[in-house]
Amino acid sequence: MKRVVVGLSGGVDSSVAAYLLQEQGYEVIGLFMKNWHDDSVTISNECPWLEDSNDALLVAEKLGIPFQTVDLSQQYQEKIVDYMFSEYKKGRTPNPDVLCNREIKFDVFMKIALSLGADYVATGHYCRKGEIEVDGKPVYQLLAGVDDNKDQSYFLCQLSQEQLAKSLFPIGELTKPQVREIATKIELVTAEKKDSQGLCFIGKVRLPEFLQQQLKPKEGLIFEVDATNQIYNQEKINFDSVQEKLAFEAKDIQYTPEVAKVVGKHQGAHYFTIGQRKGLNVGGTKEALFIISTNVETNAIYTGQGHKHPGLFKKALFVTNDEIHWIRPDLALTNGQTIQVMARIRYRQELQKATLHQFENGLYVEFETPQSAITQGQFVSWHIGDELIGSGVIS
């Protein structure tokens, strides 16, 4: 009998995942990850992990499966929290959920599970795993979940073949309402529980407050750039090569105070991200102000009025070679190659038509239509059909 360790998070999805595996005849073990216990860094006044681990325990008891808690808070601190702080310091905006899956759930946690004699690790993610043969060897596919509203394959966009080989996603074929229905039918305590929000496993994080504990406030100016500014009317140059054109399209505009007017003050450019409109506290504009650029060197924030402001849009983005990740290495591009894909630059964004261009220095993702708020440090994922084949960090 194959043994599966399920990452029981205390939510309804992983609870039902454990039940389904049991029904399929696996020997199931429930393992709860505790990822946070540093009381010196308060992340929010509600620390849900106690309640969550208790719910996970109740689910395990109900299903009659062994249950253990494993404390990964030190690894979480090193691999996720410290990384987040260093990225924010550089003015980038990291995605903790993608990192948590790559570094914790499918790495540290998976190794613990395998050491318990598990054949597989299962989670409550809304995605599916496929298997095909390439050159006589098995190749694993990361496929979108059946529930369009809940597809979570994006969060797993950094997984490797080795990790996928050992993974199971029991609820990927179901919709959220179906999962709740099963939980209600078998009377799981988590049946009505609300979906967890926020930083993978730490509960609700108020980011600026969380960041302030390491990144000190530093007053700076908020500038507004008019949508009709000449900076947006650069002559379309005749480029010598496709690469030159893409580099131009992916480049961030370097704003200076000369092209803008001061409209307010902020407490630190590193707390803000492109596309953000909350937390600026600047009134009196005809339309809402959106952040179009932050500069941590000069501690300046540049904004524009309205969600259609030209400063928000770019047609291409760049990923450096060491931050390109192919879930399907057999599909990886070599220098000079291109491929048509569908891509997204954030969770739950509708997939966008795009072309990947691989050059010696890295990969360009060129979109058919300009994209709003392409953000450094976030992940771009690329897909063919319902398969996620690769991803990279936006540079």
Swiss-Prot record:
Q: Where in the cell is it found?
A: Cytoplasm
List ligand-binding residues for ATP: 7-14, 33, 124
Any one GO MF term held by the record is: tRNA binding
Q: What is its main location?
A: cytoplasm
Q: Does the keyword Metal-binding apply?
A: no
| Catalytic activities | S-sulfanyl-L-cysteinyl-[protein] + uridine(34) in tRNA + AH2 + ATP = 2-thiouridine(34) in tRNA + L-cysteinyl-[protein] + A + AMP + diphosphate + H(+)
Which residues are named in the active-site annotation? 100, 200
Q: Is ATP-binding given among the entry's keywords?
A: yes
- Record's InterPro entries? MnmA-like (IPR004506), MnmA-like_C (IPR046885), MnmA-like_central (IPR046884), MnmA-like_central_sf (IPR023382), Rossmann-like_a/b/a_fold (IPR014729)
Tell me the protein's name.
Answer: tRNA-specific 2-thiouridylase MnmA
Q: Which organism is it from?
A: Flavobacterium psychrophilum (strain ATCC 49511 / DSM 21280 / CIP 103535 / JIP02/86)
